[in-house]
Amino acid sequence: MSGDFLALAQPGVQQLSPYVPGKPVDELARELDIDPATIVKLASNENPLGASPKALAAIRDELAELTRYPDGNGFALKSLLAERCGVEIDQVTLGNGSNDILELVARAYLAPGLNAVFSEHAFAVYPIVTQAVGAQARVVPAKNWGHDLPAMLKAIDDRTRVVFIANPNNPTGTWFGAEELDEFLQDVPAHVLVVLDEAYIEYAEGSDLPDGLDFLAAYPNLLVSRTFSKAYGLAALRVGYGLSTPVVADVLNRVRQPFNVNSLALAAACAALEDVDYLAESRRLNEAGMQQLEAGFRDLGLRWIPSKGNFIAVDLGREAAPIFQELLREGVIVRPVANYGMPNHLRITIGLPAENTRFLEALAKVLARA
C-alpha cells in the first residue's frame, strides 16, 4: 500500500503548474525528423551573438579544476560586481540565475498568511515562488500591458511582505520611468521588500528606463535582481545576482544553497563583465534586430507592444496557439504567451538578421494560409 504523495505535499505545491521553458531545438528536431541546424529558436530571450570570447577562454582555463568545489562565497565575482555597481561586497547575493534570487526572497520573507503583490502579465516565476511557500498572490491588473504602479500600491496591505516589479517587463517589454519608480518607492511601506527585476536592463542603456542602482541608497527595502543569462550570453551557466542592503543580503545568504553558483559560471561571469566590446555589440545587434522585426510586422499589418528588452510581443489579432504550431512545422520556435493572459500574442526573441528574416518569412507564409 502506497501513500498519496501528491496529497501529502504542501497545499501550495499541490496546485502548482511547473514552469514551461521555450521548446528545445533538439526536441523539435526529433518531432519533425530534421537537422537541428535548420531550426531557428527565438523563444527564450537568449543572446544570438553567442557567449563572450573572454568568457569562453575563462571557462577553458577553469576546466582543470573541476574536481574542486567552487568558491562558495563567490568572492571574485562579488568583488567585481560591487565595484561595477558602486556597492559594498556585503550587499551582493549570487544566485543560480536571477530566478534563484527570486526564490530566495520568497523562502526568506513569504509564508502562509502573507502575500506578494505583482502585476498581470508579469514573469511566471513570481507566482510560482509565491505559491510554493504557501503565500497568497495578489495580482494587479496591468495598464497598457505594463505595471500600474499606483494600483499596485493600493494592493499592499499589512500582510504584504514582497512586491515584484520588472523593468522592462517580461513578456510585454513595457517599462516605467525614474519619476514613476521614485514615487512608488516613496509610498511603499517599510515592511515590504520591493524586488526590482532588471534581467534586461543592459539592453535599455541610453533610454528613459531608470537604473535601479540609483535608488538603492535611498530605499533600504529595495532589492535589485539582475542576470548574466541575457545580454551577457551565459544562459546555460545559470548565474544571477541581487543587490540590496547588507541585512537583506545576509538573510538571503541564510537560505541560499551552498555552492549555488558553479566554478565555470563564476569564471565566465567575471570575464563577461570585463568584455565591454561584446556587450556593446550585443546592444547594437539587438537594436538593429528590433527595428527589423518592427518593420516586418508593419509590412504584415500587425500590431506589437513597444519593448525595451531583447524580445517583442506581436498581436496576431486572433488566437496565437495555432499560428505557433504552424511555425513549429516551419522549423521556427517562438513563445506563445497565453499563460500570461495574452492569447493573441506571440513573444519573439531578437535574433541574428538571418534568423529574423527566416521568422518573418515563415510568419507571412503561415498567416497567408491561416
From Swiss-Prot:
Gene3D superfamilies: Aspartate Aminotransferase, domain 1, Type I PLP-dependent aspartate aminotransferase-like (Major domain). It is an enzyme of class 2 (transferase). Pathway: Amino-acid biosynthesis; L-histidine biosynthesis; L-histidine from 5-phospho-alpha-D-ribose 1-diphosphate: step 7/9. InterPro entries: Aminotrans_II_pyridoxalP_BS, Aminotransferase_I/II_large, HisP_aminotrans, HistidinolP_aminotransfase, PyrdxlP-dep_Trfase, PyrdxlP-dep_Trfase_major, PyrdxlP-dep_Trfase_small. Its EC number is 2.6.1.9. It comes from the Bacteria. It catalyses: L-histidinol phosphate + 2-oxoglutarate = 3-(imidazol-4-yl)-2-oxopropyl phosphate + L-glutamate. Its cofactor is pyridoxal 5'-phosphate. The modification N6-(pyridoxal phosphate)lysine is found at residue 230. Disulfide bonds: none annotated. Keywords: Amino-acid biosynthesis, Aminotransferase, Histidine biosynthesis, Pyridoxal phosphate, Transferase. SUPFAM superfamilies: PLP-dependent transferases (SSF53383). GO terms for biological process: L-histidine biosynthetic process. Homodimer. Belongs to the class-II pyridoxal-phosphate-dependent aminotransferase family. Histidinol-phosphate aminotransferase subfamily. This is Histidinol-phosphate aminotransferase 2. It comes from Pseudomonas fluorescens (strain ATCC BAA-477 / NRRL B-23932 / Pf-5).
